[in-house]
Each structure stands twice: as C-alpha cells, then as structure tokens.
Amino acid sequence: MRNLISVGGPQQGVFGHLLDYGAYETFIQRTDPNKRKEYQRKNIFLTDLNCETTCNSTYKNNLLKLKNFVLIKFLKDEKMQPKQTSWFGFYAENDTNTIIPMEKTRLYQEDLIGLKTLEKSGRLHFLSINGEHLHLPPGVRNNFKLIFYF
C-alpha cells in the first residue's frame, strides 16, 4: 500500500451514551475517558493498535512505508465523539470537556506508531470537510485520487 486515506475514521475510538449498551462486547469497542482502566483491560483492538498496553513494532514499520497517510475529519460530525478522533485526538482522562490534540498524546510524542516521523517527513496530512459524518461533496473523491495517487 502506498497511500492510506482514512475518511472520518475513529483513530482513538469513540465515546457516547449509546455505546453504554455493550461498550465492550466483541462487536463494539468504545473508548471511555472516565473508565480508562476498564477500557485498557477490555478493549481488544485499539489498545493494541495504538500501543496502549503493548507495542507491536510491525504497526510502526508498516505505517512508515506509506508515501502518504491522510486523515479526514468532518467538521459537523455528530456521530463521532469527539470528532477530533479522526485526527488522533481524544478527550483528556476523566474530562470530557477537554480535547487532547494528537501532538500532545503519548502515541505521538513517543512516536509509538510512527505518526511523528510521518508528520516531520511531510507524509501525514490533515484534511477537513465542512459536512456531517461521511457526507462527501460531489467530486471530493476524485480530488483525493489526483492529489495523493500521482
């Protein structure tokens, strides 16, 4: 894979009251800033992928092979809480009023999966779309192909 475009993806997980009903079932994996220990114990996907419990160097090595990693956030997104998760941001622990941007996270600062290296080398891109979750204006997909595939 040369380029990875994540369109409104929950990089740091999602949070919200609807997820209270089965947050740690095998088909639902939410990130709860108020129950961080439980999240780290029961979430079998993001804790591994984002090096929150252990770190698999293969994840970093594979990400660093990318020519471009594009993170797209929807500015009017009400499905993803917080919408900054699309750019690896998330709520502060035990504080759903404060958003920690990617640059202030351990994941970035310690370069656990290669985000810092990608950004410093100009291969990590942040795009925003003035719309609701996954509502792409006409022609946007083709613009992404032109910018990042050639």
Give the location of each predicted region.
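Serine-dependent carboxylesterase/thioesterase catalytic core
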Residues: 1-41, 79
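Internal, well-ordered interaction modules that form the hydrophobic cores of assembly/scaffold domains
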Residues: 9, 45, 50, 55, ...
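Active-site rim elements
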Residues: 15, 26-39, 54-58, 129-139
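Generic surface-pattern signal
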Residues: 20, 51-54, 149
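Surface-exposed loop/turn and secondary-structure junction residues enriched for glycine/proline
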Residues: 31, 52, 90-94
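Active-site nucleophile elbow and catalytic-triad environment of alpha/beta-hydrolase enzymes
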Residues: 35-60, 108-113
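C-terminal catalytic-base region of ester-bond hydrolases, centering on the histidine
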Residues: 59-150
